[in-house]
């Protein structure tokens, strides 16, 4: 073996050798288990959120394979409509071209070329994590099969009256000239002016209602002013009219409970065509929707001529100046308010009234709600169900059209008078048009494409071959587990459930595991502007994929964000080193693996104890992974390997290898190492596979099946051994004595009992001699006792220090402990502290109990002075 573990030297070759075992076995008799990988954008680059979700999914897939399931992990990529189009458009801009210069077909050809040569970089980065997806089954949301399925779904939903065309408000990006989804909008809190504007009453222009707004240019789209029906200030005005400043247009004063009497002046300008809340109020009161912007966010012909054609920000300045000049400004305040920016364009998006295609999401939501309420789908952690229900119970029509070119072009054709024909093909559309209109007409194809989330919502069944009834679809649908982040519960998870329930009449998955957000070590969200982004590719270059994977798994506590700094990763790099060094130690001591060997009651008691511990560790690890407690599984394996196997068992091994049990002990040690490797493999596939192959344990751990056994093995006295050793070390520490100093000791025990452990105790506790003693009183000299489970070990300190010095040391430590106890006791009696910080209070309480126990232990020593 190499002196040090070098992941760069082994990972690539091991991964290639393992790939044949990543495939699902369609004709297997094993129980199927399936995970659909959330498809990353083809424009994407691997970030820590990706690394976390892929690591957790891979742990599940490898674990299920190892426990006998036929595991399918379906990979693929998303065409990422707007993002991909922008990448190619930027390339064209560098050549002083636009997509319009090329035309739609030529531009799309360019995009496909880009996708072919550059669009799969994210897949190569995924593979750097050594994840075991069934790569040969990889799908793309715009490949031929999925495109066919998307058309099928759109046409069916339209003919079921669940898709329709409507003029509604959308998030409009004036730079990209398309509607965008809420998730593509970045909300920033910014300081902005809050203009208080006087709106004169129509029947008494000397009286006015003051309206506060941050967007005075939209006043030309006002079609009402609203007040709360219980606001006493405005009772006399409800039902009257006011005059819009500058234009003098009459608009009504209405009552609506949406108005907040405590905010601003309590009176709100209602602009249904340019504000989402106003749009709903307008619907309730049947108000006109007056659009005053064009698609570039310039004011249109619906406003006074002097403002027409002005960009909205320039128009805002001009409107404010005119309002001030005409005496309509009451005052100007500064406030902190939310501004909405396009994630990709960087400019402010506008609520904009435009014709779009919509899904009647409310009709699809009820079965999706029922699926979770009934327990057919479970969220882990469970509290995320509340978020899911909140969104679906308040669901709005889903805008599925985008005004771009890259994507699934909507299968709709328009007739000469606006007739709509939704069919799977152009030929079918013309045939239906000919039948309905009675003559041949020229149809115009809809230019809009579908929202990327539309095709993604079909991912669990279209990737398995739907609408064809394939063997894969029958075997692997419904899938089992979805692993994803909380931010797309609505945008993706809920929509997959809606579509699965509608088209498959069954849930798309049984469990939704929502993982945490990866933050920096201070708990702050990572962002380029803060300069605190950690690149997983750089971490893997430096430490290897196993270290990053194990770090993420160990920190993946449910419901708690991950605080990640490079120091954490370095710490788990040491764990890899520990595994490597343990394996080298066994090799140096000529331990060899025997595939037919299983430890028995004939083995040394310490070997039996190690065996029993591993069998219990295997059971708990399997339980943790079945319950999605990746953190407990990883931490349990870490603690066990480092402290039980290395610090205890391998240290004892140095003595056992000199005993009559040496041959069996070597086999037990290698059996134990293999069991650790097989349990660690789902989390750390590279180092475990390498060592298993090197020691001829198993050709490929990816194909190894975990199994559990029940056996009665000795454990009790071995536990006492470790506790005695710990007590000796602790006592040396109390007296400020070097742990390596050799001392004399004697053990009070019946003759013959504990003999199997004495050599190990002598070696690991650093005794120059270990005799037998048959009295509860120590021999002559300066002895202090270590008492564990009915066994008393007297340790002689004559060679280390005199009694007076030892007593003085212990008294000083006792006094310091008493001060800590008094301080903690006083702190815990503060009821306000307990109420304000219950978790911290509990930690302090447990610390107090520990300190009291330490104090009692010290007190017991004084009787020996």
Where would I find each of the regions flagged by the language model?
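Catalytic adenosine-cofactor/nucleotide-binding cores of aminoacyl-tRNA synthetases and other
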Residues: 341-345, 386, 518-522, 526-603, ...
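Gly/Pro-rich turn-and-neighbor structural signature
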Residues: 16-18, 145-176, 184-186, 198-202, ...
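Core structural elements
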Residues: 117-121, 126, 574-587, 607-616, ...
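C-terminal low-complexity, glycine/proline- and small-hydrophobic-enriched intrinsically disordered tails
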Residues: 570, 693-865
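N-terminal, positively charged nucleic-acid-binding surface of large information/translation enzymes
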Residues: 1-230, 254, 271-284, 288-306, ...
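Acidic, turn-prone loop/beta-hairpin segments
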Residues: 78, 174, 180-186, 414, ...
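Alpha-helical recognition segments enriched in aromatics with Gly/Pro capping
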Residues: 201, 257-259, 285-297, 404-407, ...
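Conserved phosphate-binding loops in nucleotide/dinucleotide-binding enzymes
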Residues: 188, 270-273, 313, 350, ...
């Amino acid at each position: 073996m190499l002196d040090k573990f070098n992941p760069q030297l082994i990972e690539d070759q091991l991964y290639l050798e393992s790939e044949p075992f990543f495939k699902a076995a369609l004709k297997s008799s094993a129980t199927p288990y399936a995970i659909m990988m959330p498809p990353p954008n083809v424009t994407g680059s691997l970030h820590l959120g990706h690394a976390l979700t892929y690591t957790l999914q891979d742990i599940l897939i490898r674990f299920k394979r190892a426990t006998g399931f036929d595991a399918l992990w379906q990979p693929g990529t998303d065409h990422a409509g707007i993002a991909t189009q922008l990448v190619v458009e930027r390339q064209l801009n560098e050549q002083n071209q636009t997509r319009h210069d090329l035309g739609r077909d030529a531009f799309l050809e360019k995009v496909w070329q880009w996708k072919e040569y550059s669009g799969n970089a994210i897949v190569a980065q995924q593979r750097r994590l050594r994840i075991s997806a069934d790569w040969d089954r990889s799908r793309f949301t715009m490949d031929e099969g999925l495109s066919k399925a998307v058309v099928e779904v759109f046409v069916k939903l339209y003919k079921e009256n669940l898709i329709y065309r409507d003029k509604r408000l959308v998030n409009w990006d004036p730079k990209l000239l398309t509607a965008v989804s809420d998730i593509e909008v970045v909300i920033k809190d910014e300081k902005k002016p809050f203009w208080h504007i006087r709106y004169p009453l129509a029947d008494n222009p000397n009286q006015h209602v003051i309206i506060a707004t941050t967007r005075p240019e939209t006043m030309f789209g006002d079609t009402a002013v609203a007040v709360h029906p219980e606001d006493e200030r405005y009772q006399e005005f409800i039902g009257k009219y006011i005059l819009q400043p500058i234009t003098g247009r009459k608009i009504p004063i209405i009552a609506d409970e949406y108005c907040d009497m405590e905010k601003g002046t309590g009176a709100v300008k209602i602009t249904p065509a340019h504000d989402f809340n106003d749009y709903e109020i307008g619907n309730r009161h049947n108000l006109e929707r007056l659009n005053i912007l064009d698609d570039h966010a310039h004011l249109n012909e619906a406003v006074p001529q002097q403002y027409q054609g002005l960009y909205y920000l320039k128009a805002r300045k001009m409107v404010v100046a005119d309002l001030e000049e005409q005496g309509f400004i009451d005052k100007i305040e500064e406030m902190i308010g939310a501004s909405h920016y396009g994630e990709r364009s960087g400019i402010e998006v506008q609520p904009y009234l435009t014709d779009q295609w919509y899904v009647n999401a409310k009709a699809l939501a009820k079965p999706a709600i029922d699926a979770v309420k009934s327990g057919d789908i479970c969220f882990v952690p469970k509290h995320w169900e509340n978020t899911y229900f909140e969104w679906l119970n308040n669901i709005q029509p889903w805008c599925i059209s985008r005004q771009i070119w890259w994507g699934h072009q909507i299968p709709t054709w328009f007739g000469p008078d606006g007739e709509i024909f939704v069919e799977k093909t152009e030929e079918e559309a013309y045939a239906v048009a000919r039948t309905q209109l009675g003559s041949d007409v020229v149809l115009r194809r809809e230019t809009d494409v579908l929202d990327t989330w539309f095709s993604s919502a079909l991912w669990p069944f279209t990737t398995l071959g739907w609408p064809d009834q394939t063997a894969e679809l029958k075997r692997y649908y419904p899938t089992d587990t979805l692993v994803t982040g909380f931010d797309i519960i609505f945008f993706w998870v809920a929509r997959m459930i809606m579509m699965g329930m509608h088209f498959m009449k069954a849930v798309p998955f049984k469990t939704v595991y929502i993982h945490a957000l990866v933050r920096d070590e201070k708990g702050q969200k990572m962002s380029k502007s803060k300069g605190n982004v950690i690149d997983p590719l750089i971490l893997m270059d430096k430490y290897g994929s196993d270290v990053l994977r194990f770090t993420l798994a160990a920190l993946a506590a449910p419901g708690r964000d991950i605080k990640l700094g490079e120091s954490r990763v370095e710490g788990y790099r040491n764990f890899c080193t520990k595994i490597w060094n343990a394996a080298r130690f066994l090799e140096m001591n000529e331990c060899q693996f025997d595939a037919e060997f299983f430890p028995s009651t004939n083995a040394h008691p310490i070997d039996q104890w190690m065996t029993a511990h591993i069998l219990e560790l295997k059971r708990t690890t399997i339980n943790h992974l079945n319950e999605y407690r990746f953190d407990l599984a990883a931490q349990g394996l870490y603690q066990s390997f480092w402290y039980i196997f290395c610090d205890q068992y391998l240290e004892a091994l140095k003595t056992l290898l000199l005993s009559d049990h040496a041959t069996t002990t070597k086999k037990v040690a290698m059996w134990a190492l293999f069991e650790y490797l097989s349990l660690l493999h789902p989390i750390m596939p590279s180092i475990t596979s390498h060592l298993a192959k090197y020691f001829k344990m198993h050709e490929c751990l990816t194909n190894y099946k975990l199994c559990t056994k029940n056996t009665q093995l000795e454990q009790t006295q071995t536990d006492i051994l470790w506790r005695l050793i710990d007590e000796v070390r602790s006592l040396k520490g109390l007296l400020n004595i070097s742990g390596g100093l050799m001392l004399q000791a004697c053990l009070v025990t019946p003759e013959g009992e504990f003999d199997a452990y004495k050599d190990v105790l002598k070696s690991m506790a650093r005794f120059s001699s270990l005799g037998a003693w048959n009295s509860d009183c120590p021999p002559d000299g300066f002895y202090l006792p270590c008492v564990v489970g009915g066994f008393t070990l007297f340790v002689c300190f004559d060679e280390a220090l005199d009694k007076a010095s030892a007593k003085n040391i212990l008294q000083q430590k006792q006094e310091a402990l008493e001060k800590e106890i008094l301080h903690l006791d006083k702190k815990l009696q503060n009821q306000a502290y307990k109420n304000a910080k219950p978790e911290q209070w509990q930690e302090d309480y447990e610390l107090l109990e520990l300190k009291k126990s330490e104090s009692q232990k010290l007190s017991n020593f004084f009787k020996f002075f």
